[in-house]
A protein has these predicted regions:
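AAA+/P-loop NTPase substrate/partner-engagement loops
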Residues: 64-92, 152
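Structural recognition of the conserved hydrophobic beta-strand(s) that form the central parallel beta-sheet
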Residues: 116-118, 143-148
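Conserved amphipathic alpha-helical interaction elements at protein-protein interfaces in regulatory
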Residues: 28, 58, 105, 136-137
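Conserved alpha-helical scaffold flanking the Walker A/P-loop in AAA+ ATPase domains
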Residues: 21-25, 93-114, 122, 126, ...
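Conserved Walker B
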Residues: 119-123, 151
Length: 266
């Protein structure tokens, strides 16, 4: 029998107050229908959003091991929808319409649905206004999780409709220690992983993936070699770099195709 997996919430040990607050909210049945996670980049807001989504959709408040929890951890659950701005100037109206059209639909696998809206400060007035009513009174079983850096740079109408959750700044040293505890790797390697991946949780995933580490090594070698390269070498090595970059993406695409096949009957 495979060992039980820890829930994503349990792994948020660099944000203990956030972890405990969200855990208690889900366990007590008092989870809000709309959260606004606020904090600096690298504070773990996106990791916490996926963790909350996992706990909210799990019938055991985030056991970490059931089919639903595994799918959320792999970012392949059909009832967790992740949005990020598709334009350099912010969210497009088409994105908002797509979200609003999906909200009334029944969940595919779970009994509820979660919408994660990253960089919510880039919701412009024309796109944000369309969200307001749904954000204030969403259908039963729908949760919104918005991520932003500061309430001061967001529309007040959005902030007032969400329960704000502040995230403290996590120092590189604390982040590296968290990764070291989870992986058993030395601190120097863990500091590198956090710097490369952007957060403790993704740093742990990086250290557990031989493919990602190999791709990074090849990219670093290719970039270093460009210093002494002539024009012909630059073109040749640029092409090889593209191959290296595409390799992990091909792996992700293969995983996504398998998930689509599994969900084809829904």
């Amino acid at each position: 029998m495979a060992p039980a997996q820890a829930s994503l919430l349990a792994k948020l040990d660099t944000q203990e107050r956030v972890r405990d607050f969200l855990t208690n909210a889900v366990a007590s049945g008092r989870a809000s229908h709309a959260y606004l996670f606020l904090g600096a980049p690298g504070a773990g807001k996106l990791d916490a959003a996926w963790a909350l989504a996992q706990a909210f959709l799990c019938e055991q408040d985030g056991c970490g091991s059931c089919d639903s929890c595994v799918r959320v951890a792999r970012h392949t659950h059909p009832d967790v929808h992740y949005y990020t701005p598709e334009s350099a100037t912010g969210y497009l109206i088409a994105q908002t319409r797509e979200l609003l059209d999906d909200v009334p639909l029944a969940p595919i696998r779970a009994k509820a649905k979660v919408y994660i809206i990253d960089r919510a400060e880039q919701l412009r007035a024309n796109t944000a206004n369309a969200l307001l009513k749904t954000l204030e009174e969403p259908p039963e079983g729908v949760m919104f999780i918005l991520l932003g850096t500061s309430a001061d740079v967001m529309l007040p109408t959005i902030v007032s409709r969400c329960q704000c959750v502040p995230f403290r700044l996590v120092s590189p040293a604390v982040a590296a220690q968290a990764v070291s505890r989870a992986t058993g790797q030395d601190l120097a390697r863990c500091r590198m992983a956090v710097a490369v991946a952007g957060s403790p949780t993704r740093g742990i995933e990086f250290l557990k993936s031989a493919e990602r580490q190999d791709a990074r090594r090849q990219m670093v070698r290719a970039i270093d070699s460009l210093i002494a390269a002539d024009e012909a070498d630059v073109l040749s090595r640029a092409k090889s770099l593209i191959v290296v970059v595409k390799a992990p993406l091909a792996e992700v695409k293969s995983t996504q195709e398998k998930v689509l096949e599994q969900n084809a009957d829904y």
